[in-house]
């Protein structure tokens, strides 16, 4: 098995052309054709069909793509694992998280990480937890911090942070003086909601009995925008306690406990079970284990 042949095969499958793949890989078209012929001889199957000026994968080619990607990824992992043994963490930490986690959780963690490993560059993939998990599973992202629960037997999952959800109101809202608030009282207020995500799913479930009297004034994709509009008095929102510290500290807003139900948001560190983490990512996991993980180690979801 020649890894170079597999690289050529994957480029042709992406570009739909032997000549364009050759140009990208700085190889002549005859050399590209020879590599594919050798692969086809090895597997005993035709891998491409010509369709006009382009080429398309055969059924055998489609089957090979999955394994070709896996083999090349394993090659890179093995090279990284061996070279990392002789050096302190370098390279890039590829991490995924949603917007709120990037803004309100990661800065302190990254500051501690950077003090220990200044040579590591940090690359953040920002998206919803579901998308972050997809990127971890396909190997694009090394580790992710996502909202739990996560159900995936292919992932190692550690609980690292639990935050209380509270009602955020403007300082001028009469509820700002309340010691607590019920779901029914919240339902009487104009609502500013996230468009999607864990908190929105939780809200929709909790307030289903109050749907008739709910007034949703705004739906926003950004936690930062939600906080600004709540502070301006345009509505209320259920939000993680740690996300609203600045607004509470400045006096622009208040956080009111919800009395008839205990609401929390739990964050977890996730990464693939079957993959050797790059040294930079492994160092990040170790740092979080020291700072955040409970004494019993991995979250129960990882023990399946």
Task: Describe the role of every protein-language-model region.
Residues 12-28:
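Short helix-boundary/capping micro-motifs
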Residues 70, 85, 108-112, 129-165, ...:
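Short beta-strand-centered segments that line the small-molecule binding cleft or hinge
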Residues 105, 254-298:
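A late-sequence structural motif
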Residues 90-153, 211-213, 220:
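Central regulatory/effector-binding core of bacterial HTH transcription factors
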Residues 128-133, 137-141, 146-147, 198-256:
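Hydrophobic hinge/microswitch elements
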Residues 152-159, 163-164, 178-179, 185, ...:
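Beta-alpha-beta core module
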Residues 189-210, 277-286, 292-301:
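Secondary-structure junction motif
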Residues 18, 40-57, 62:
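A short LG(V/I)-centered, amphipathic sequence patch enriched
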